[in-house]
């Protein structure tokens, strides 16, 4: 049973099928393959293993580029260890190791043009790179055998408005990106557009989920505040009824007090719609604040401290 490919391998499968438009870009990609792919000249006769990989798409890509730019016959060999496991593909050139090294020496440094730089970065990523799935920890990295090559790539990436960090590890020098926008830019530069879409879809989903959570939290906070306020107002109303008496309150205050006692969780708008005739939020708020003020006055001075205002008047017959 075949195991599903990881996001990193899916990205490499996609990049292995990208063909640069210009010959200079294709050559830059081949240079990255040969520099980082562990050339092996210990073959019988005048042969050099240019590249070894278990992935056929990548072997085909290196084979195609080598045939285009190397002035020697190139072929692909595959083998299985004792007939088991995945096949290993070797791209072999009929040329001595020194000839290949001389060809590389004539193309030292990093490419000059942005399109060639992107192709070179794609080749390097296909050989030594990896990228985490977008739903996990954001991380893209490239591994180099020495500080000089890592420094060259770091400079190239900086020219492409990327800011990779450099770290020394046991397996070599690692350039890595942690920022999701930087990773998306790197994938886009290399031509991994399906991977970019996958990344952006996950980021959009995360953003929408965060927005929903913020709205829910805000609504919850508002609801909690409304309920707490309603309970406090209901407690003040019960205190007034117990001290100054229900009939001692003006009719407008008696009406809102009765509704608030029945619905301590209701909002100002909902309370206003329960009155006859309905009253707006500001009117409801004014009456409730008036009740709270009366409750404070009575608590401070007793029943004698409460004198109904003319605008709300004394109880009417």
UniProtKB/Swiss-Prot annotation:
Keywords: Cell cycle, Cell division, DNA-binding. One of its GO terms (biological process) is cell division. It comes from the Bacteria. Pfam families: HTH_WhiA, LAGLIDADG_WhiA, WhiA_N. InterPro entries: Homing_endonucl, Sporu_reg_WhiA_N_dom, Sporulation_regulator_WhiA, Sporulation_regulator_WhiA_C, WhiA_LAGLIDADG_dom. Transmembrane segments: none annotated. Residues 267-300 bind DNA. One of its GO terms (molecular function) is DNA binding. The keyword DNA-binding applies. NCBIfam families: DNA_bind_WhiA (TIGR00647). Belongs to the WhiA family. PANTHER family: CELL DIVISION PROTEIN WHIA-RELATED (PTHR37307:SF1). Involved in cell division and chromosome segregation. This is Probable cell division protein WhiA. The lineage of its organism: Bacteria, Bacillati, Bacillota, Clostridia, Moorellales. The gene is whiA.
């Amino acid at each position: 049973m075949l195991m599903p490919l990881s996001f990193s391998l899916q990205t490499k499968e996609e990049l292995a099928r990208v063909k640069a438009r210009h010959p200079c870009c294709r050559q830059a990609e081949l240079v990255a393959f040969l520099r980082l792919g562990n050339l092996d000249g210990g073959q019988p006769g005048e042969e050099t293993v240019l590249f070894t990989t278990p992935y056929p798409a990548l072997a085909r890509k290196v084979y195609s580029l080598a045939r285009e730019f190397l002035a020697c016959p190139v072929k692909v060999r595959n083998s299985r260890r004792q007939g088991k496991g995945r096949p290993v593909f070797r791209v072999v050139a009929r040329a001595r190791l020194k000839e290949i090294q001389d060809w590389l020496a004539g193309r030292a440094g990093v490419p000059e043009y942005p399109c060639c730089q992107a192709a070179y970065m794609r080749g390097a990523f296909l050989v030594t790179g990896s990228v985490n799935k977008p739903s996990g920890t954001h991380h893209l990295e490239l591994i180099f055998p020495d500080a000089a090559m890592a420094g060259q790539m770091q400079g190239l990436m900086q020219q492409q408005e990327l800011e990779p960090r450099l770290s020394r590890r046991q397996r070599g020098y690692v350039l890595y990106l942690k920022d999701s926008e930087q990773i998306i830019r790197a994938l886009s530069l290399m031509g991994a557009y399906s991977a970019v879409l996958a990344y952006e879809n996950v980021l959009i989903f995360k953003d929408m989920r965060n927005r929903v959570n913020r709205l829910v939290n805000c609504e919850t906070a508002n609801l909690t505040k409304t309920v707490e306020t309603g309970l406090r107002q209901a407690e003040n109303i019960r205190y007034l009824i117990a001290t100054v008496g229900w009939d001692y309150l003006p009719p407008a205050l008696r009406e809102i007090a009765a509704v608030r006692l029945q619905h301590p969780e209701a909002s100002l708008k909902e309370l206003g719609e329960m009155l006859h005739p309905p009253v707006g939020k500001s009117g409801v708020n004014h009456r409730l604040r008036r009740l709270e003020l009366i409750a404070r006055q009575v608590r401070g001075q007793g029943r004698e401290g409460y004198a109904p205002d003319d605008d709300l008047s004394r109880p009417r017959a």
